[in-house]
Amino acid sequence: MLIRKLISRAITASVIIGVVLIAACSPNNATPTPIYQRISDAKLKAGDTLPAPTGDIILTVTGKIGTKNGADNIVMDRDMIESVGQVEYKVTDPFETKDYVYRGPLMSDLLDLWKVGSDATTLQVVALDDYVVKVPIADIRKYPVLFALQQDGQYMPVSTRGPAMLVFPYNNFEFNQTVYNDYWAWQIKAIDIS
């Protein structure tokens, strides 16, 4: 009887040790791959006074913003946008079905810089060809959406969707592409926040 109890305890202990070892070695406990890589830290941060742009203005921001550097708006050149800090990630472009590495600031960092209040719900993004799309701010806050200025290490000219475009991390999250493909606005010239 004593031998059976000892054998039973030894088997139970072996099973527990085996389960612990398997769980410890499983990929679920591995360090997750980061969604994006930080390329540069912010030099222009939320709460800072916005300087006047020194280069060509590529973005005008209006609406529910808590700061301005223009008459009733924010105007930004490429250097200002990049000074918010840049990240990059690889994503399969839904329009070209090809992987690209996009780089630019996170839209959430831009919203913070612009002092967008909690009562704002929508970004109305306007492109150079007057394409307009309304993007929920909740999605901008939930996902690491890029205000991309570069594609595969090159600034995007207007002829290839520049100077800027919104990029969603399709490779890392499940998106309803019927809805979200419309949010991939490019040739962005203005954003109105409501």
Question: Positions of the model-derived regions?
Answer:
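C-terminal motif of bacterial Sec signal peptides marking the signal peptidase cleavage site
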Residues: 21-24
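N-terminal intrinsically disordered, low-complexity segments enriched in P/E/S/T
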Residues: 26-194
